[in-house]
Regions:
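Conserved H-X4-D acyltransferase segment
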Residues: 9-27
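Structural signal for interior beta-strand "rungs" in well-ordered beta-sheet cores
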Residues: 12-13, 29, 42, 145
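Short beta-strand scaffold positions
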Residues: 14-15, 37, 147
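Short alpha-helical
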Residues: 18-21, 41, 153
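Conserved phosphate- and dinucleotide-binding cores of soluble alpha/beta proteins
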Residues: 43-177
Length: 177
C-alpha cells in the first residue's frame, strides 16, 4: 500500500529505521527516484540500484547504530525539499506523539518532516502506547500514518480530527471485526 504510492520520478527521504530499510528494499526497482537518507544500511542496500539517485546526509556516525546524525546531517537534509519523508519511531502515544530514544535521531527526523510535501509516519503496532525519551512530533506534524493493524476506534477518531490519513492492510480491518 505505501509502496504503491512511491512512484517513478519522486523524491523521498528515508530515516535510519528498520522500517525505512524494509521500504527501501521494496522500492529500489523504481525509475528516476531520488532518495535522501541518513542510513548507512539503506545506502548499502541501494548501492547497485541502477535507476536511483541516492544522497547521503553525511554527519556523525551515531552510537550503536548505522545512522549519520548531528548538525551536519541535519543541515544537509534541510537543503532539500522532497515529495515525501518517511520516518519511523521507537514509540507512539496518541497524546504524547511519536518519540525516539536518541536525541540526534529525533532531531534528524524532525528536519526530514520539515522539508517535504507529505509527512509519513510508518509505525508497527508494537510501538503503540510506548513513549521513548525524545519527542519527535505530534499528530499535527504528520499527514499519513502507515501501520500493520487497524487502530483502536479512539485513535481513528483522533486521526480523523487531526486530518491524518491512516493506512493499514485490508486484512487487518477484517481481523478487527
Amino acid at each position: 500500500m505505501l509502496f504503491r504510492s512511491i512512484t517513478d520520478n519522486m523524491s523521498v527521504m528515508l530515516d535510519c529505521s528498520s522500517t525505512a530499510l524494509f521500504i527501501a528494499r521494496r522500492i529500489k526497482d523504481r525509475k528516476n527516484l531520488t532518495i535522501i537518507t541518513n542510513s548507512l544500511e539503506i545506502l548499502i542496500e541501494l548501492k547497485d540500484a541502477k535507476n536511483l539517485k541516492i544522497f547521503s546526509s553525511g554527519g556523525l556516525l551515531g552510537e550503536d547504530s548505522f545512522a549519520l546524525v548531528g548538525n551536519q546531517a541535519d543541515r544537509m537534509i534541510s537543503e532539500f525539499h522532497v515529495n515525501a519523508s518517511i520516518i519511523s519511531c521507537k514509540g507512539f502515544d496518541i497524546d504524547k506523539g511519536f518519540t525516539d530514544s536518541h536525541d540526534m535521531h529525533a532531531s534528524t527526523k524532525r528536519v526530514m518532516l520539515e522539508n517535504c510535501d507529505t509527512r509519513v509516519l510508518a509505525v508497527d503496532s508494537s510501538k503503540f502506547n510506548h513513549i521513548a525519551f525524545n519527542v519527535v512530533g505530534t499528530l499535527s506534524d504528520i499527514d499519513v500514518i502507515v501501520t500493520d493493524v487497524k487502530p483502536p476506534k479512539e485513535w481513528a477518531e483522533r486521526f480523523e480530527k487531526a486530518k491524518v490519513e491512516c493506512l493499514y492492510p485490508a486484512d487487518a480491518e477484517e481481523a478487527a471485526k
